[in-house]
Amino acid sequence: MASPAPRSLSSSSSSSSSSFCPSISPPPRSPSRASLPFSVKCNTVEPLKLVNGKPSVPILDEQSLPKFLHSKRLESSVNRSNTRLKLFSGLANPALAKEVAWYMGLELGKVKIKRFADGEIYVQLEESVRGCDVFIIQPTSPPANENLMELLIMIDACRRASAKNITAVIPYFGYARADRKTQGRESIAAKLVANLITEAGANRVLACDLHSGQSMGYFDIPVDHVYCQPVILDYLASKGIASSDLVVVSPDVGGVARARAFAKKLSDAPLAIVDKRRHAHNVAEVMNLIGDVKGKVAVMLDDMIDTAGTITKGAELLHEEGAREVYACCTHAVFSPPAIERLSSGCFQEVIITNTLPVAEKNFFRQLTVLSTANLLGETIWRVHDDSSVSSIFQ
């Protein structure tokens, strides 16, 4: 019997090898990088600048190691060429993966990722991972289903190639908001996704600022929760705002614990809460403000900004209550329409986000500042690989 004809690959297929993101090139690694001072402030957190008319996101350089990271592991191991640690990136956020690899002094592993003409995903590792400690950097960001499936197939490929350990590094964990039933006959999709990642062959998950703490319990494998607050705190501290002028605001009751912890680290600033009622998905109505913001610089903190309805209505209320300036801070910038229109409408002095999700050029606006989490993720990966403490990074 004749063998079946091979399926054709779509013309839009792409590869996540070292050439997949030509627009953002990491600086060359220096053999003396391990001896750099760690007291220098992070300078990757400047607002976006225009280069030849196009927005440019600052990338890591030799002076960009944030002060809260003091890695003895980096000093002793960053230049080891015989490490059994392998970093791979999916196609969801290759720029972040490149920055993480640069910080760690490693090259991204070579992997071919393509799409068949019918939309199916093809993954082939182009180097051996046998006996290696493999870390796959792939946020399950929009399009969530496609990026999730790509992650699962990459995990499966590593497992079948005899990797010793496989860690799924998920800067943004899609479906995290579907963490409980709010009505009858609903799915708990966060638990389902956790099961899929586990069954695919992952031994560990590393995730940034999960929407709710209980999501960690949905996994039957260890989960390292990376808190990105130090990155934002470091940036706010560099702005020189008087501590007596600050107030941290939670945009809803569910984020009070997060905002309280943030306020304590931000010069023990006072806390305010926006009480709102949600009548439908992606629709929020601001009802009341608990706390005093008159004449203050209000820092609104949330784990993510999706349509920006909650945080924008909260900012409007803060201005009505006499706030001098309002800053919006979040880890995950989902930016579903009409988020950009709302955020750039003038309610915010600055919108501070991180690069756990890639931000399309069309979504850049004047008040936007993008902070890099690459140092934090790279340090966490080293410590997981070394069986060292991760929680000590955030103490």
UniProtKB/Swiss-Prot annotation:
Q: Where does Mg(2+) bind?
A: D209, H211, D220, D224
Top EC category: transferase
Give the stretch annotated as transit peptide in the record, renumbered to this chain: 1-42
**Spans of biased composition, class Low complexity?**
1-23
- What are the record's GO terms for cellular component? chloroplast; cytoplasm; ribose phosphate diphosphokinase complex
Alphabetized Gene3D superfamilies for the sequence: 3.40.50.2020
Reported EC number(s) for this entry are 2.7.6.1
Q: Which InterPro entries match?
A: PRib_PP_synth_CS, Pribosyltran_N, PRibTrfase_dom, PRTase-like, Rib-P_diPkinase, Rib-P_diPkinase_bac
Instruction: Write down the chemical reaction(s) this protein catalyses.
Output: D-ribose 5-phosphate + ATP = 5-phospho-alpha-D-ribose 1-diphosphate + AMP + H(+)
Q: Which domain of life is it from?
A: Eukaryota
Molecular function (GO) terms listed?
ATP binding; kinase activity; magnesium ion binding; ribose phosphate diphosphokinase activity
Location of the protein in the cell: Plastid, Chloroplast
Set out the biological process GO terms recorded for this chain's protein. Answer: 5-phosphoribose 1-diphosphate biosynthetic process; purine nucleotide biosynthetic process; ribonucleoside monophosphate biosynthetic process
- Which keywords does UniProt give here? ATP-binding, Chloroplast, Kinase, Magnesium, Metal-binding, Nucleotide biosynthesis, Nucleotide-binding, Plastid, Transferase, Transit peptide
Q: Region Disordered: which residues? A: 1-33
Span list, region Binding of phosphoribosylpyrophosphate: 295-310
Q: Among its keywords, does the record have Magnesium?
A: yes
Q: Which family does it belong to?
A: Belongs to the ribose-phosphate pyrophosphokinase family.
Q: Which NCBIfam families match?
A: PRK01259.1, PRK02812.1, ribP_PPkin
Which PANTHER family does the UniProt record give? RIBOSE-PHOSPHATE DIPHOSPHOKINASE FAMILY MEMBER (PTHR10210), RIBOSE-PHOSPHATE PYROPHOSPHOKINASE 1, CHLOROPLASTIC (PTHR10210:SF41)
Task: State the name under which the record lists this protein.
Answer: Ribose-phosphate pyrophosphokinase 2, chloroplastic
